[in-house]
A protein has these predicted regions:
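HIT superfamily nucleotide-processing domains
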Residues: 1-155
């Protein structure tokens, strides 16, 4: 199976918005959702185009799940949400990626799935994305694996 599929918008998104990337391993890439209505909302994407978790080779599956737990733990420590939601769907685009969504009692969708109906959007200024990434990165292990982005290196 090819590691990238030209018609997959998730494969294409791996190289977009490098300023939102805050963690990378050989298996996964973590980046902030541009919509930060839920502070810290992260996509953790498998770098290879694969569609089914249960069909991944064991070492890749373990690393992908470990990466998800590493990112979720960092989000919990950095942002202290009331809950963390984890979603691995594949209905809209069949490419393995986690939605890791910190939830707060004060959020406008509290008690409901974030997909329920229309919801407001929240874009941040570039310096606010950078601050948020720094806050999360402070709780990630192995600084040598952190992805340096052009925005982070300009400081």
């Amino acid at each position: 199976m090819s590691s990238e599929q030209s018609d997959c918008w998730i494969c294409q998104s791996l190289s977009r918005d490098p300023h939102l990337v805050y963690y990378e391993t050989k298996t996964s890439l973590a980046k902030l959702n541009p919509d930060q209505l839920f502070q810290g909302y992260t996509f953790l994407t498998l770098k290879q185009h694969r569609e089914h978790l249960h069909l991944l080779p064991e070492n890749m599956r373990k690393q992908f799940l470990d990466d998800m737990l590493t990112v979720a733990t960092a989000l919990a420590k950095a942002l202290n949400p009331d809950r963390l939601n984890y979603e691995l769907l594949g209905n809209a685009q069949a490419h393995l990626h986690w939605h890791i969504i910190p939830r707060y009692i004060s959020d406008p969708m509290w008690g409901r799935p974030i997909w329920a109906g229309n919801r407001p959007r929240r874009r941040l200024a570039s310096e606010d994305y950078s601050r948020l990434k720094d806050t999360i990165q402070a709780h990630l292990p192995h600084p040598r694996t952190r992805k340096k982005t052009p925005l982070a290196t300009q400081r």
